[in-house]
Every structure is written in C-alpha cells, then in structure tokens.
Amino acid sequence: MGENLPLLLSAALGKKVNRPPVWMMRQAGRYMKIYRDLRERYPSFRERSENPELSYEISMQPFHAFKPDGVILFSDILTPLPGMGINFEIIESKGPIIEDPIRTLNQVENLKELSPSESLSFVGEVLTSLKKDVNNEATVLGFVGAPWTLAAYVVEGKSSKNYSLIKSMAFNKPDLLHKLLDHFAKSIGEYLKYQIKSGAQVVQIFDSWAGQLSPQDYDIFAGPYQKKVVEIVKAEYPETPIILYISGSAGVLERMAKTGVDIISLDWTVDIEEACKRIPRGIGIQGNVDPGILFGNKESIKERIDNTFNKIKDRKYILNLGHGILPGTPEENAQTFFEHGKKLTY
C-alpha cells in the first residue's frame, strides 16, 4: 500500500498514529445548510444519491467545511437493491418504501445477481473522483447494508417498529429467509469489492437492525452472513479494513468480534471501558459518543470527547458518534467535535 497513508487508513491498519482519526456517520446531510439548500433544488433522495455529480458534491460538503479524516460516499444502504430487481423510493420523513416486498420463494428465486459495474457504475464514478480529489488528505470510505438489515427492509416493505414480518419469516419459513440472506451476502460482498476497486480505502458494514435480534438469533440470521460478506471481500482485498456497525449492539459485541471485521463501531449505550474488555485487543473500536451531546454547549462536547478518549487511549480507536449525526444539530457544534477531536494526542 506504500507509506504516506492518510491518518484514518493508517489507524485502521493498526499502524502507530499521533492522534485518533475523526469522522462522523451521516456527516453529509440535513444538519448542514448547504445540503438543505441543495435538497430544495433536487428533492428526490434517489437523484441526490444516484446522480454522480450530486453524490460527489454532497460527499465533499463536510470535507470542505470541517476537514474530517474520513470522507464517506453519500449513498444509501438500499442503493444496490434495484440492481437485484427490487425497486424502492425514499419518502422525506417516512423513509424507504419497497414497491413490491419480498415474501415468497418465487420472488427470492427471481432476484437478479448483482453486477455492480453495470447497475452501480455511478457509485464507482463517485468513489474514483473522491479518491483522486481528496488526494490522501483524508481516507475515502465506502459502505453497505448487511444482509439481515436489507432483508428486514425488503420483507417488511418499509421501516418497522417491531419487525414482525421478517421475524415471522425467520420462525415459520427459515429456509426461505436463509435463501434471501445468502443472496444478499453474495451480492453485498461483490458490491463492497467494487467499491474498493473504485477507490474506497476503508469500508463499513451497517447492520442497523441486527440489534433487534436476540443473541441466539443473531448467531443464526445475522452473524453468519456478516461473516460471509467479510470473507468474500477479504479473499480479494485482505488488507482493506472493514468496520461493522450495529445499533443496539451491547448484547452481541463478542459475537461481532468473531465475524472477521477489523473494527467494531459502538453505539452510545455501552460503556466504552466495558466494551474494551469484551472486544479482543486486535480489533479496533470506533464511535460511542452520544450524538445527542452535539445539542449541548461546546464545553460539554469537549468534555465528552476527552472522557471517551481517556478510557480508550491504549486501544486502536477512531473518534465518531454512536449513531449518525442528528438533523437539527448546530453546525458549529459539529465543528467543535472535529476541531477538538483533532487536538487529542496519544
């Protein structure tokens, strides 16, 4: 990979660094006025995320504003679905709507194999431009949704509070669900490889809804498919660091560590000292800062960052929030998060 690597990539690879890198999940988005202004001109989320010029511009907005150590592709975890024959729309304030939810064997068997270079070439274009223009001043990140979370969306047909439809499938027709999960694992593995080939230097897997599973069901329906995605990627790109994020993961941290990922991204509901004891030392840790703290004053933000970092100084760590930054967060508080984060030293 050569030396003079950007800080986040160096840290993710386990190299000695002077300070923890800092970026934020959803750092490009609604809390930024420049994004809201662009959204007025381009109200369709799918257009913003699938038009390469717009996706590139939005991805770069926080880089120009705050100079984070990571620049993440502006996209969505559902973006690869149409390439498998599953159409969706994202409705403002309602979230994603799947036009034809997947609930039968016939539907699963008729899903297309994902060919990222054909159906997702716009993603490749954006990542290639980001890699060139960021020019190692920051690390370019790609991301995907994990099989369980994608399945939850396509079976439920929309966001859900209790996941009754996919859980009904899990406990009544487990073979059908496993077939769907396996299809997603292969496709998502290929999609991640395409992102890396196009310019992503670190990638993150979001299994946002795996925290809705009991630990024993995580071992059946989520963990094995996360592992399969990781194995597909590592077979071709063994050096590329992979981060795994699950919302509500306090009950499954040890299980996450067994998937083969390099870094575990924590939400804010687990004490970071406890997490350090439960996650093997060879695995890095990211996040854990409550995004709600960014509604506080500057001193409370700085204090929380210091408090978090002091508990994890002897571990590989990437400063981040425990969830995406929330809409309505004051931009100057995001600025404080980045500025103070960059003052930390090992």
Curated annotation (Swiss-Prot):
Its EC number is 4.1.1.37. GO terms for biological process: protoporphyrinogen IX biosynthetic process. It catalyses: uroporphyrinogen III + 4 H(+) = coproporphyrinogen III + 4 CO2. Pathway: Porphyrin-containing compound metabolism; protoporphyrin-IX biosynthesis; coproporphyrinogen-III from 5-aminolevulinate: step 4/4. Belongs to the uroporphyrinogen decarboxylase family. Homodimer. CDD domains: URO-D. It is found in: Cytoplasm. Substrate binds at R26, Q27, A28, G29, R30, D76, Y153, S208, H323. Catalyzes the decarboxylation of four acetate groups of uroporphyrinogen-III to yield coproporphyrinogen-III. The lineage of its organism: Bacteria, Bacillati, Cyanobacteriota, Cyanophyceae, Synechococcales. Keywords: Cytoplasm, Decarboxylase, Lyase, Porphyrin biosynthesis. GO terms for molecular function: uroporphyrinogen decarboxylase activity. It comes from Prochlorococcus marinus (strain MIT 9301). It comes from the Bacteria. The record marks D76 as: Transition state stabilizer. This is Uroporphyrinogen decarboxylase. One of its GO terms (cellular component) is cytoplasm.
